[in-house]
Amino acid sequence: PGPPAILPFTRLQGGPMDYTPGIFQTDIGKIVPWGKKMQTTICNQLGLYVTFYSPLQMAADFPEHYEPFMDAFQFIKDVAVDWDKSIYLEAEPGEYIITARHPKLSSLNKAAEGVGTLKDGKKGVVSNATKFVYAFPDDATVEDLWHAEPHDVWYVGGITDENAREVSVKLDFLKPGVKYEATIYCDAKDASGIPDEHYNAQAYTITKKTVTSKSKLKVRMAPCGGFAVSLRSL
């Protein structure tokens, strides 16, 4: 087994790291003559946003490489970059890891013009405020914004080595008695991130379903693949 499945157990033990995820054109030979195929899939790239902690995140590919896959790119637009709770659901060093994370208020990957005066008396930006900032007066506080957000949000990500895996993800970390909409980004049945004649890194499926804390999600990770899930309370 090799990277990136080993990194959460080695380098990331020392703190956050910049891994520049989000590569959707995984055949680098189509960009430069000397390029090679990456050991990854699109869903592996999405899973990195959750399994690797990096509070300053990026989308590392060219904009034109995202255009054919805007439905998958939606996860990059949605996912947070900093967390107030992290749960490691399953893991085997160097082989695979599945992580669930709950975002901090100020970490969701959205932009806001401004939110007025914060608790310390300074003007500031709270990035989760986009859709309701206009409704608050100049003396709005971070606490005001937090209580105005009606949804509980979680993200789950998984990555694997060269071995395909089918996993059953327990959602018992969700609030009991609350329904959530799960958006599941998963490797397709014929996906593969191994650079051989079966290479098919851009094959994925996106499904939505209603779940609770008693639910389990069955997902497949292709060789060198992964998955990502966004969960939003209804």
Question: Which sequence ranges carry the predicted segments?
Answer:
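C-terminal beta-sandwich/jelly-roll accessory domains of carbohydrate-active enzymes
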Residues: 111, 124-128, 132, 138-142, ...
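Short secondary-structure junctions and interdomain/linker hinges
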Residues: 54-59, 82-86, 228
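Glycan-recognition surfaces
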Residues: 1-65, 109, 191
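Short edge beta-strand/loop segments characteristic of extracellular beta-sandwich folds
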Residues: 157-159
